[in-house]
Amino acid sequence: MQGNFSKKIDPMSNLPFTVAALYCFAPLPQYESLREPLAQLCCANGIKGTLLLAAEGINGTVAGSAGAIEKLIAHITAIPGLGEPELKYSHASEMPFHRMKVRLKREIVTMGVEGIDPLKSVGTYIAPKDWNALIADENTVVVDKRNDYEYAIGTFEGAIDPQTRTFREFPEWVKQNRDRLEGKKIAMFCTGGIRCEKATAFVKGLGFDDVYHLKGGILKYLEEVPREQSMWNGECFVFDERVAVGHGLAESDVELCRACRRPLTPQDKLSQFFEEGVSCAGCYAERTPEDRARYAERQKQVKLAEKRGANKHIGS
């Protein structure tokens, strides 16, 4: 499956599915009432993916035909008080999602810290073309705002890995590492930008002034910055069946461990602990023999379903 990102839906794309990654922070006191109309619109138009609604706004990634996605974006943009979301389009040869979910949440991206409002205070946005100069500055601390399994398959040169498993762990990491950040320019990045909205707001709230984040995230950087000028190494994990993308947003050969959902490079699959659908080096010790036996049976059913031509995502 191929994929590429752009600011607008490309009418010349020969790929049948348009993928829209979007978010918008805005006061939405009526967010619960928005769920059903969104779900109905998506169902009626063959759109799949996930949309999260909360009192602080909307976040999600969805896929469908170009016309269907245009209808959805028009509907979202017309929601009173919301306005135009931060939006990135891509195209794919296969549907990258299995189903459609519209969920009500406390936060559209969960950090678990009360009072963080990106509408009031965030870091300075840095365009992809200016990012290299910032992170090459010896007075800049570069912080990968993603989780450890995302960092493991790709990151920027010199970036710190906070070794977090979830976004909720980031505030504690900052508090424990203040000495590494004091007196420095702090440059943060994440996949598409939304986690950095809250992360930079949080860090600024602790009294740090020189706080920056990559506008449009890694995806926009990989789209706009030529490979020969790039300071990115590896692949960028994405939260759908494409798994990861590289420079130019070309799909990579990274796959998912279907037992734990960690990304696996071809080298990872050479591990003695890797068994397709059952375990990988990252999760083998976390599972009991009973767990692995259950996963093995599930994998067997997946393979049987594939032979019958049934949905290939059974058990995934």
Curated annotation (Swiss-Prot):
Protein known as: tRNA uridine(34) hydroxylase
Keywords, sorted A to Z: Oxidoreductase, tRNA processing
An example Gene Ontology biological process: tRNA modification
This enzyme's EC code(s): 1.14.-.-
Gene this protein is translated from: trhO
Lineage: Bacteria, Pseudomonadati, Pseudomonadota, Alphaproteobacteria, Hyphomicrobiales
Organism annotation: Brucella abortus (strain 2308)
Disulphide linkage map: none
Presence of keyword Translocase: no
Coiled-coil residue spans: none
